[in-house]
From Swiss-Prot:
Protein's gene: napA
Source species: Aeromonas salmonicida (strain A449)
Binding sites annotated in the UniProt record for substrate: 795
The protein, known as: Periplasmic nitrate reductase
Cofactor(s) recorded in Swiss-Prot or TrEMBL: [4Fe-4S] cluster; Mo-bis(molybdopterin guanine dinucleotide)
Recorded catalytic activity of this chain's protein: 2 Fe(II)-[cytochrome] + nitrate + 2 H(+) = 2 Fe(III)-[cytochrome] + nitrite + H2O
Amino acids binding [4Fe-4S] cluster: 48, 51, 55, 83
Main location: periplasm
Length: 829
């Protein structure tokens, strides 16, 4: 077969990805079929199923199966390339243990919490599920039911879930697994700017003079963006890359200034940089005077542990996010304590490296982009870390302009589009609205055509609190969708598993595979995956992308959207709402939650014939274009309020659009005149999320971690991902090539630490914390190179549950878990 130049370039990209992953190029190349004139394969576009980068892929289907994928050459995000995981997308749906029937724990044909899983029909599954939810609502009320959702939900799945829980069941006990990864970014954005999500976009990469990575291993976690950054760095000798982390990883290979710091001391480093800018008269006074204000945050705010935990009990201001106005002079005095000498000593980073970092930010001629992911966010002071990074960009005016700005990268395909924008958090509604604001609740009730007072004002249980409430018997009917929280959540032994197995609780898990979470449940519902349904994701740069259903799911598997809407038919309003609420809209009497929420004259207004895809199972089932109706109703929340989304049909034609989309035009840089339609002529910059248009510069101190090494537990443990696997490995470990490339988790350890324990590379060790232990093998070489005193272990391996070890400490403001810092000991097995 003769290859075109484009095919040749793609083959080379595949070979490069294969070399990184340690698999053979021919294996990959067999999965790369590119030309429809040479095959009978049908091609269509879809965003990648994995991380939050938002790469677009072309999906090839044949005979009812996805048989090939390739990078979309017309996609502005990835420009025809995929990472190693993306090249194997065609195989994620075809694991041998794919679930195709609901499975219920039973003994002698009846539900039994301690019984074995047995197949049941969908009607039987919904019968027992509705029985348990109704009984819980009747006995204990809405606060005893809950749902744990996902940043992998499609936009309309998350929206349908939010309506069912917050309006239908009248509970805010809905939270996404994005609580574990993006909540600190959300609260950081809201505190500083009054609006969520980055102001810049990926176009910054090609225009920046320097990049600073704070707790982000982009080389493995966001490899397509890393390839664009590498191209920028290697094609221009004046471009710099600075990398900060608690251990060396692959991103250090490109670093001009690599810094390994003691865990938690990034807070001090950030304050040092701000101090350097002030001391060296590098403040952009015109910007600061026009566009910022200064506030001092409350300190000693605790660690989000149970109130009875000794560490939490010592906190003077647990969970207090208040801040008081202060002057610039007072702010300058505050950060003056973070001088070069003391911060170098505290952090373990040399003075030379710290000063080089500070000089970069302070140089007015250098355009700088700061990137971060879980190193900042999974942090007991993650909100503070986000705020302190914004301080640096605000002090220098390097923000909301091409090539300069702070940028929080996301780890899931729709953590932004679904969890954040739709508002599937326990405290949120769509478009940055919150349940605690009566005006916001009134807006939602009006759009949803609901009686006043339907949506409760109480913030629901967040992710970590949900596990605690399950254990304590206060949350009894619980639905988990599109995540594997038993493996991914913290402190599995003490908090997660006891709650799932509590006899008072009924746990439902919707998943395509029998995950660790599914195996701990009472009822498992088999779900459709990725292009087996029509979907939409929102990526890290505010880009919303759509795709059509391209193949049918296995017979018996149903999408999360279908499950949510079909389950709603099981409830009459009289069974879930008080009589006084129904009396406000008597026409709702006798109707089901499906009628009220999804057949309300808005969601069901578009005929199913408008769907352009070859398949649309949900629309066929319900008789109207479900996805379009849900999206257009949802989009009402943000239009005219800085969260504008384009009309539904426009997204199917485009490779995504970055909101706000006004008059058909997307926005690349927010808050800047000439780019953002919400900034008027003459304003220059306006942070319109704040009433006065001014962003906040916060005075926030260094505070220690919730748990640190001591004499018995003498090492730091950090967890995370590797290139070849995604999160808990539910999909990637079922791809043979990816499994072979990295089959089992290992403990990355400094050679001298291993030697001191009498352990050689490849030997088994037992890693234990105050909460549990796991057995694994030691790796003293390779991609991750921890300093002495710290070990790193990925969490993708279901046979080595590293979250038996982790502490369920959270940022008290965002409630996001700190997976990067707990104390362990390592002994030879």
């Amino acid at each position: 077969m003769k290859l075109s130049r484009r095919d040749f370039m793609k083959a080379n990209a595949v070979a490069a990805a294969a070399a990184v992953a340690g698999v053979s190029a021919p294996t990959l190349a067999a999965n790369l079929i590119t030309s429809t004139d040479k095959t009978a394969i049908k091609w269509d576009k879809a965003p990648c199923r994995f991380c939050g980068t938002g790469c677009s892929v072309l999906v090839g289907s044949q005979d009812g199966r996805v048989v090939a994928t390739q990078g979309d050459p017309d996609a502005p995000v990835n420009r025809g390339l995929n990472c190693i995981k993306g090249y194997f997308l065609s195989k994620i749906m075809y694991g041998e243990d794919r679930l195709t029937q609901p499975m219920l724990r039973m003994t002698n044909g009846k539900f039994d919490k301690n019984g074995d899983f047995a197949p049941v029909s969908w009607d039987q599954a919904f019968d027992i599920m509705a029985e348990k939810f109704k009984a819980t609502l009747k006995e204990k009320g809405p606060t005893a039911v809950g749902m744990f959702g996902s940043g992998q939900w499609t936009v309309w799945e998350g929206y349908a879930a939010a309506k069912l829980m917050k309006a239908g069941f009248r509970t805010n006990n809905l939270d996404p697994n994005a609580r574990h990864c993006m909540a600190s970014a959300v609260v950081g954005f809201m505190r500083t700017f009054g609006m969520d999500e980055p102001m810049g976009c990926y176009d910054d990469i090609e225009q920046a003079d320097a990049f600073v990575l704070w707790g982000s291993n982009m080389a493995e976690m966001h490899p397509i963006l890393w390839s664009r950054m590498s191209d920028r760095r290697l094609s221009n000798p004046d471009v710099q890359v600075h990398v900060l982390s608690t251990f060396e990883h692959r991103s250090f290979e490109l670093a001009d200034n690599g810094m390994v710091f003691t865990p938690q001391t990034d807070l001090a480093i950030l304050n040092y940089v701000a101090n350097y800018i002030i001391q060296n008269d590098k403040v952009n006074w015109e910007f600061v005077n026009k566009h910022t204000q200064f506030r001092k945050g409350t300190t000693d705010i605790g660690y989000g542990l149970r109130p009875t935990h000794p560490t939490e009990a010592r906190a003077k201001n647990p969970g207090n996010g208040d801040a008081t106005p202060m002057s610039f002079d007072d702010f300058a005095k505050f950060v003056a304590d973070y001088d070069l000498e003391s911060v170098s000593k505290l952090s373990g980073v040399s003075k030379e490296k710290l000063e080089k970092l500070a000089q970069l930010y302070a140089d007015p001629s250098k355009k700088v982009v700061s990137y971060w992911t879980m190193g900042f966010n999974q942090h007991t002071r993650g909100v503070w870390a986000n705020n302190l990074c914004y301080n640096i960009h605000l002090l220098t005016g390097k923000i909301s302009t091409p090539g300069s700005g702070p940028f929080s990268l996301t780890g899931q395909p729709s953590a932004c589009g679904t969890a954040r924008e739709v508002g599937t958090f326990a405290h949120r509604l769509p478009a940055d609205m919150v349940v605690t604001d009566p005006k916001h609740r009134a807006i939602a009730e009006k759009i949803w055509k609901l009686p006043e007072g339907t949506i409760p004002e109480q913030v629901g249980y967040h992710a970590v609190l949900q596990n605690r409430m399950l254990k304590d018997g206060k949350l009894n009917a619980y639905w988990v969708m599109c995540n594997n929280n038993m493996q991914a959540g913290p402190n599995m032994n003490e908090e997660a598993l006891p709650g799932y197995r509590n006899p008072a609780n009924f746990i439902v898990v919707s998943d395509p595979y029998p995950t660790v979470t599914a195996q701990a449940a009472d009822l498992i519902l088999p779900t459709a995956m990725w292009v087996e349904k029509e979907g939409a994701y929102g990526n890290a740069e505010r880009r919303t992308q759509f795709w059509h259903q391209q193949v049918k799911p296995p017979e018996g598997a149903k999408s999360d959207l279908w499950q949510l809407m079909e389950f709603a038919k099981r409830f009459k309003v009289e069974e879930v709402w008080p009589a006084e609420l129904i009396a406000k809209q008597p026409e709702l009497k006798g109707k089901t939650l499906f009628d009220v929420l999804y057949a309300n004259g808005q969601v069901d207004q578009f005929p199913k014939e408008q769907s352009k895809g070859e398949f649309n199972d949900e629309s066929e089932s319900f008789g109207f274009y479900v996805q379009k109706g849900l999206f257009e109703e949802y989009a009402t929340f943000g239009r005219g309020h800085g969260h504008d989304l384009a009309p539904f049909d426009q997204y199917h034609e485009a490779r995504g659009l970055r909101w706000p989309v006004v008059d058909g035009k997307e926005t690349l840089w927010r808050y800047r005149e000439g780019f953002d339609p919400y900034v008027k002529a003459g304003e220059g910059v306006r942070f319109y999320g704040k009433p006065d248009g001014r962003a906040v510069i916060f005075a926030l101190p260094y505070e220690p971690a919730a748990e640190a090494p001591d004499k018995e537990y003498d090492m730091w443990l950090s967890t995370g991902r590797v290139l070849e696997h995604w999160h808990t490995g539910t999909m990637t470990r079922r791809v043979p090539e990816l499994y072979r490339a990295f089959p089992d988790a290992v403990l990355f350890m400094h050679p001298e630490d291993a030697k001191a324990r009498g352990v050689r590379r490849g030997e088994e060790v037992i890693v234990s914390s105050r909460r549990g232990e796991v057995k694994t093998r030691v790796e003293t070489r390779g991609r991750n190179r921890p300093p002495k005193g710290l070990v790193f272990m990925p969490f993708f391996d279901a046979s080595q549950l590293v979250n038996k070890l982790t502490l369920d400490a959270t940022d008290p403001l965002s409630k996001e878990t700190d997976y990067k810092k707990c104390a362990v000991k390592v002994v030879k097995a």
